[in-house]
Amino acid sequence: MSVPGPPRLVVALDFPAAAPAEALAAQLDPRLCRLKVGKELFTRAGPQLVERLHARGFEVFLDLKYHDIPNTVAGACRAAADLGVWMVNVHALGGRRMLEAAAEAVAAAEGRTLITAVTVLTSHDAATLEEIGLAGPPREAVLRLAGLAQASGLDGVVCSPEEAAAIGERFGAGLLRVTPGVRPAGAALGDQQRIATPAAAVAAGCDHLVVGRPITAAEDPAAAAAAIAAEIAAAG
């Protein structure tokens, strides 16, 4: 099976070590999906794992959510771009100077790594935001941070399916929307609060859909990934 155009499905390799991550990758088709490497796996397995995933034909989203002083984040983003990853991300809460430094660092590197900003984590709800000093509904914070990311020269934002449509309406299709919290109908919620099915996420305007446990914990990960990729393609 193949899908038209570049794959929009991103499979989250949320594993504690390289061996199970690579075993899962061996069952997947790079024509159907990209792969996401997060903090735990990257800390344990390092850039060498990313290089091995590249050798299998996969494009990699390096999901490390950098948030530090501008110079430090710029250096980290430059290193990610030099590694050849498809996408890297930062926290929009790092502020304009940090976001601009990150965007400039990626733009100056060889190749074309996309850079996106995390707005509000999908594990956060209004009560959680209030605890950290961000009063109001998550949607308001997401839109404010998405605008900051766009003004700072980033390619897109990481947002929940709930806010994707509002971001598109306000900022246009040119700002990519990368969406975790995607679950097929009937799947367990896990630690996500603001979720949607793949078809609903596409209908909301999401460009890239990140799916983890519904694929990685499936009895047949290849079949699960193919089914979700087909649902995404059918939805638009």
From Swiss-Prot:
Gene3D superfamilies reported in the protein's UniProt record: Aldolase class I
EC number in record: 4.1.1.23
Pfam families membership: OMPdecase
Pathway(s) of this molecule: Pyrimidine metabolism; UMP biosynthesis via de novo pathway; UMP from orotate: step 2/2
Molecular function GO terms recorded: orotidine-5'-phosphate decarboxylase activity
CDD domains named among the record's database cross-references: OMP_decarboxylase_like
Top EC group: lyase
Catalytic residue list: K65
UniProt GO BP: 'de novo' pyrimidine nucleobase biosynthetic process; 'de novo' UMP biosynthetic process
Catalytic reaction(s) noted: orotidine 5'-phosphate + H(+) = UMP + CO2
GO cellular component: cytosol
Swiss-Prot/TrEMBL keywords: Decarboxylase, Lyase, Pyrimidine biosynthesis
Residues binding substrate, per UniProt: 14, 36, 63-72, 122, 183, 192, 212-213
Function: Catalyzes the decarboxylation of orotidine 5'-monophosphate (OMP) to uridine 5'-monophosphate (UMP).
NCBIfam families to which the protein is assigned, alphabetical: PRK00230.1, pyrF
Subunit structure: Homodimer.
Entry similarity comment: Belongs to the OMP decarboxylase family. Type 1 subfamily.
Listed name of the protein: Orotidine 5'-phosphate decarboxylase
Record organism: Halorhodospira halophila (strain DSM 244 / SL1) (Ectothiorhodospira halophila (strain DSM 244 / SL1))
Top-level taxonomy: Bacteria, Pseudomonadati, Pseudomonadota, Gammaproteobacteria, Chromatiales
Name of the encoding gene: pyrF
